[in-house]
Amino acid sequence: MHRPLPIKKILRYARNLLIFFFASTILAVIVYRFMPVYVTPLMVIRSVQQLASGDKPTWKHTWVSFDKISPHLPMAVIASEDNRFAEHNGFDFIEIEKAMKENEKRKRKRGASTISQQTAKNVFLWPQSSWVRKGFEVYFTFLIELFWSKERIMEVYLNSIEMGKGIYGAQATAKYKFNTTAAKLSSGQCALIAATLPNPIRFNSAKPSAYLLKRQKQILRLMNLVPKFPPVEKKAVDKKDTRKKKKK
């Protein structure tokens, strides 16, 4: 009986592996379009790191829906992290070009990751930077932009991002940093939270340094310049649709 050549077996395994990868990742993205994200790889990694260093693992995280988060917070992170979030398709090529030009002249490199890219990384990938992870990040960013709405991306981002040592998401940050709820965060508190995001372990929004307070003022000013999110027009259309359904 003729046996298939090893190369054919390898190709068949590779094909099956690719099919499994695409099917499982697309399914995961579709599931998370509707389901709250309670655990992320970063949460697990941070807990393991704390255990390895002899510390007690700290894991503070409570999922809340987008309408239970202060409207100032999405505005603050857009102003701070990604002012074209509502316009781009996951990648801000204007910022990428700017970063490339700036990085030619400076030692400390700056990134141009969008909120969509950060969400893809937070939910599906590991934090350590590498070309492999960047490749997967591009792939997952494409998928969430395809299957999720911008509001859903922002909802997941604000619920999953690291905002302090062992603190993840808006609700936990509001409780443990400001003794309030995510819905009641003020514009100033939201600007402080956004100011810590480049390094939430180093910066503490509850005890802001002079640098953090300066950055807070910058973000508050920028919040008045970026477009409202979600767009006012979209919210008005959603309300009209709801009223029509009730009448029927």
From Swiss-Prot:
Subcellular compartments: Cell inner membrane
Record-level GO cellular component terms: peptidoglycan-based cell wall; plasma membrane
Family: Belongs to the glycosyltransferase 51 family.
Keyword Metal-binding assigned: no
Entry's transmembrane regions: 17-37
Function text: Peptidoglycan polymerase that catalyzes glycan chain elongation from lipid-linked precursors.
UniProt keyword annotations, A-Z: Cell inner membrane, Cell membrane, Cell shape, Cell wall biogenesis/degradation, Glycosyltransferase, Membrane, Peptidoglycan synthesis, Transferase, Transmembrane, Transmembrane helix
A molecular function (GO) term: peptidoglycan glycosyltransferase activity
Membrane topology: Single-pass membrane protein
EC numbers: 2.4.99.28
Coiled-coil ranges (or none): none
Pfam families membership: Transgly
Pathway: Cell wall biogenesis; peptidoglycan biosynthesis
PANTHER family: BIOSYNTHETIC PEPTIDOGLYCAN TRANSGLYCOSYLASE, MONOFUNCTIONAL BIOSYNTHETIC PEPTIDOGLYCAN TRANSGLYCOSYLASE
Substrates-to-products reaction catalysed: [GlcNAc-(1->4)-Mur2Ac(oyl-L-Ala-gamma-D-Glu-L-Lys-D-Ala-D-Ala)](n)-di-trans,octa-cis-undecaprenyl diphosphate + beta-D-GlcNAc-(1->4)-Mur2Ac(oyl-L-Ala-gamma-D-Glu-L-Lys-D-Ala-D-Ala)-di-trans,octa-cis-undecaprenyl diphosphate = [GlcNAc-(1->4)-Mur2Ac(oyl-L-Ala-gamma-D-Glu-L-Lys-D-Ala-D-Ala)](n+1)-di-trans,octa-cis-undecaprenyl diphosphate + di-trans,octa-cis-undecaprenyl diphosphate + H(+)
NCBIfam families (UniProt xref): mono_pep_trsgly (TIGR02070)
One GO BP annotation of this record: regulation of cell shape
Broadest EC class assigned to this enzyme: transferase
Protein name per its UniProtKB record: Biosynthetic peptidoglycan transglycosylase
